Structures are given as structure tokens and as C-alpha cells.
From Swiss-Prot:
This is Phosphate acyltransferase. Belongs to the PlsX family. The keyword Lipid biosynthesis applies. One of its GO terms (biological process) is fatty acid biosynthetic process. Catalyzes the reversible formation of acyl-phosphate (acyl-PO(4)) from acyl-[acyl-carrier-protein] (acyl-ACP). This enzyme utilizes acyl-ACP as fatty acyl donor, but not acyl-CoA. Its main location: cytoplasm. It comes from the Bacteria. GO terms for cellular component: cytoplasm. Its EC number is 2.3.1.274. It comes from Fervidobacterium nodosum (strain ATCC 35602 / DSM 5306 / Rt17-B1). Homodimer. Probably interacts with PlsY. The keyword Secreted does not apply. The gene is plsX. Pfam families: FA_synthesis.
Amino acid sequence: MIRIALDLMGGDRAPEEIKAGALMYLQNVKKTGRKVQLVLVGLADTLKEFEHFKSEGLVELVEAQEALPMDVKPTDALRRKNSSMYIASQLVKEKKAEAIVSAGNTGALLSCATLVVGRLPGVDRPALAVPVPSLNDFTILIDAGANAEVKHEWLIQFAAMGIEYAKILGKRNPKVGLLNVGTEENKGTELEKQAYQLLKQAFNESFYGNVEGNDINIGTVDVVVTNGFSGNIAMKTMEGVAKLISHTIKQEAKKSLDGILGALLFSRTLKKLKKKLDPRTYGGSFFLGVDGIVVKAHGNSDRIAIYNAIDVAVRGVEGKLVEQLNERLKVYNK
């Protein structure tokens, strides 16, 4: 039985959309018979409607005393041990759950992941890894928002985790690139210049060199490493462009008979495109480098995104992501 701790109180749309996503997932579990139990952590009044699932063994209800606001400081998150996020993290630490899913504040979840759940050996800072759609299937963007400021040695660890994550997802001999304002070796701040040399030494032929923002979706490399500040801006920009494309196609299809006929003719293709570009499809992203599965859902997640975030966590447990990553990182820690 896989046990997933879900923070019902985290996110811009909490608790209603988080609860709705949990209900959707529970219905799927009942239908498919998957061996998954949700450990729902929230304020007392948010847990009531899940009581009837207890007799079926589909849920465990854990009461929290408070919800962390979305603007909470990471250090405050660690002090508020009665919050839903902290309690859910503690459940993973104590092996009472295999994973935590939260749409709460990223910095707060990073603090809980790092200092409550704990880090893998040799990892200084966990990082948010996002598989981004590309012309070459996908590109791993790491860090996508966890660490706004980084040290150049952290970027080496991010690259190592990104490479091994890409291998787990099926990439053979993945190439890593450093996000920069140009491809020349001398581009960027001192941080990027130092990181470039260290990446070159550490990964040899696996290091492609500097890459630019457009290379992420082109798929020039399999892993793009950067600080969380630049990574988050890049990710949010791509989300905005995806919405623009979807909206433009929809609007143009309505303007003429040719557009309507074209939309009907290519409806299946357009649906696939929309699904691929929709951030909700991917649900959530892993904090890599943590000694447990920690999935960060988008702060603005709706029920569909939460459903998919839970599924991401389940697949992470089933695929033994933490165990594989821990084993693969040993080569870098010698």
C-alpha cells in the first residue's frame, strides 16, 4: 500500500480545490483498485467529508491546527509545527507516508523537505526539477524555483541530480547545459563563469556548455541547470506562452468557416497539443535530493492539477525515485 500525505491547506485555491482533487483521486482508486491510501492533513472542518472513506481503508485523516499562508517565511514554517505542511512532512520523515504533495509556499516546502524530511547524502540543497515539453520529448529544468540564490557548487549537484533523473525517465547519455545570456564560454556573471568551468571538469563530454532560454523547449540538451530565480521565470514564461498559443488557436478557429473546418479536421491533434501545453497535465514537480518523495504542486493548482500531482507522487514511489537517485549519486560523492 502506497501512502501519500496530502496537504489540504496549501495553495491559492485551498482547501476546496485540493479536497476536490483528492476526491477525484479516491474515486479513481475505488474504480481501478490501485493500492494507494491518501493521508489527508488539514483543519478539522476540512476532513469531515472524507470520513466515509475510512471504512474502506482509502484514507487516513490527520488533523492540523493551522494552515500556512502563501506568503509565509520559510523559517516561520519550521516553527509552526502544528501546520498541515509541517505535519505532512513529519509523516514522511517517520515513514508513516511515502510521499508528501503540497501546493503551498515553495520556500516553506523546501525548508520542510530539507530540515524535516532530510537530504540525501552529499546533497547540500534540494532543487525543484521540472520536465518541460520540448522538440526532443522533454527537457529537465533544474532548479525551477526552490533556491533563488545559489553557490556555484550547488549547480554541480543540481546538474548531477538532473542527469540521473533524466536517465530514470528514459534519456540515454543525457547532455546538460548551463542557462545563460549567451552560448559563449565567457558569458554571464562570475557565478555562471565559475559554474561553467566546474561543470566542464565534472561532466566532461556530458556538459554541452551554455544554453539560452529558447534551447529549453527546442531540446538542445536534456538537462538545463540554473538558479531557482532564473528557472522560475523561465518556467512561468513558458506557461504564459502555452496559454497564449491555446487561446490564439481557439480564437482564430472561430473567425471563419475555414477555421471551424480546420479545427474539426485537426480536433484530435489540437486536443493533444492543448494537453501537452497545459501545466495541469504535469500536476507537480519533485524536489530532488530529499530522502523521501516531495511533490510541489503549482500554487494556483485546481482539482485536475492536484489529481495529477498525487499521481506524480504515486509514480515516484512506484519507480523508487529516491532509492534510484541515492544509488546513482554515490558516484559523485566519492
